[in-house]
Amino acid sequence: GGLDYCIGSVHLVNKTRGGDLWFIDGSKQQSYDEGLSRVFDGNIKEAVRAFFRQTNEMIASQRPSIVGHFDKVAMHNKERYFGTDEEWYLALVRETLELIKECGCVCEINTRGLYKGRYSDFYPATRIIRIMNTMEIPAVVSTDAHQPDDLDKFEGVYTLLREVGYKRLVYFDGTWNEMKVF
C-alpha cells in the first residue's frame, strides 16, 4: 500500500525544540492569545516567523503532496496583532510559496474558516491566492471537512478562482489530474 497522498500543515508552534507549544488552531481565540503570551512573551512577529519557519521545515523535509492552510496563523489574529498586508508578513508568505513551488507541492485552498465563521477569507487568503496564480502554483480545493455535513461547503471559491485568473485546479482520483475552473 502506502498513502495516495499526504497533506502537510502546522497547528502547533514552538519557540525552541521540545519547548512549550502555541496552539494556533481550534475554536477558541483565547487559546491563541494565551499561547502567544506564554510561549512568545506576546511577540507576534517572533511567533509568526516561528510558524513559517516550521511550515517551511515541514515542506522541505517531508515534501507533502499538498500543503494545507499555510496561513492559518492569521485565523485567530483577526488583524489584532498584525495586518496580513504588512510587508514582513507577505515576505514570509512569498518565501513559503517559493518553497512550495520548488518542492513541487500542491497548495490547498480551504473553505473551512468561512463556513465555520472563524475567518473572513479562504486559507490561504485571497491576496495570497492571487500570488499563487501568478507563480503558477497548482491548487486543490478542500473544505477541510471534519464531519460529513461539511463536505460540500464550496460556496464562493470557484467564483474567486475565476476572478483571480486561475484556469485549472488539480484533484486526485487514483492519480493526479487537472480540471478547468468552472
Give each language-model segment a name.
Residues 1-102:
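Extended substrate/RNA-proximal surfaces in nucleic-acid metabolism proteins
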Residues 21, 80-182:
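Charged catalytic cores and adjacent phosphate/nucleic-acid-binding surfaces used
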